[in-house]
């Protein structure tokens, strides 16, 4: 059974010679919390605006619930959008901000009152009806913007970096609230962000974008554990890259030569071709072990600690070995400045924790 609710079919959007979105195709399921993630200028907001109807594609088409919406104006689409700057009218109170636009739907006063009360309860703003924008905190303004978008009962809510203006603690709180809200009301959310942690903590699936293209579309766990290329591995979390070349295939493994470390059998999850130098090995910091003594792990390197950063729940180490100029690893075990004599240490890696990636 195909539950595809939104279908993006070979969509491109050009601004002059700039390909903001370049031949993108994917599907979003009904009731899904779906994120578009990428750096500034990657095309994620343009793609969201194409879904909203604020931009029209150069080529390709968009289907929503089986209906072609490619040429429909924004007010004819079953979507609504929440902006980063909230776009709250300062001269009218919360209740009238949320009511704005409902009159055009031909609703009675009683229907409008019920919808507004319901959505105020949904976003936890009961009692704030008479307040103005200047009397609200950042989080409350965000809730007003959400309420105004949801009161029209869209099939899809589009969110353009809605938490970007909030401080970290409030942003973390709003992430949890947004996720809970989406699950409670059950509609499809399409969420744009440049914040990796935000995307992987909230989403059912994430599309990672770069230069107008989808680099990988997967669950958060799959993106982190099995990135498809060097861009995704580097953009999602933190990693160590080691230069490598592939040799011969050996079942599900491939013989790979890691620069200055030797030749090893690495699991070839991406079916990377033999005899290729266009590859790297990626090792996540938390999969490595730092210790005062040599281990029996597959790879064990003697190194020197160059810098440490205490992060509360963990300590981050920047280490130099004779084979590798800089390695980053983390440990949940507390180490002070006296833990390692002369800053000497051993770094251990298991081969199962090494991902072989294409550079592109």
List each model region and its residues.
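ABC ATPase nucleotide-binding domains
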Residues: 33, 72-234
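The feature captures the beta-strand-to-loop junction immediately N-terminal to the Walker
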Residues: 37-39
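ABC ATPase nucleotide-binding domain helices that frame the ATP-binding cleft
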Residues: 45-48, 144
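Helix-to-loop junction immediately C-terminal to a conserved catalytic motif
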Residues: 52
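Conserved ABC transporter NBD signature motif
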Residues: 60-68
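Non-catalytic connector elements of ABC transporters
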Residues: 239, 249-360
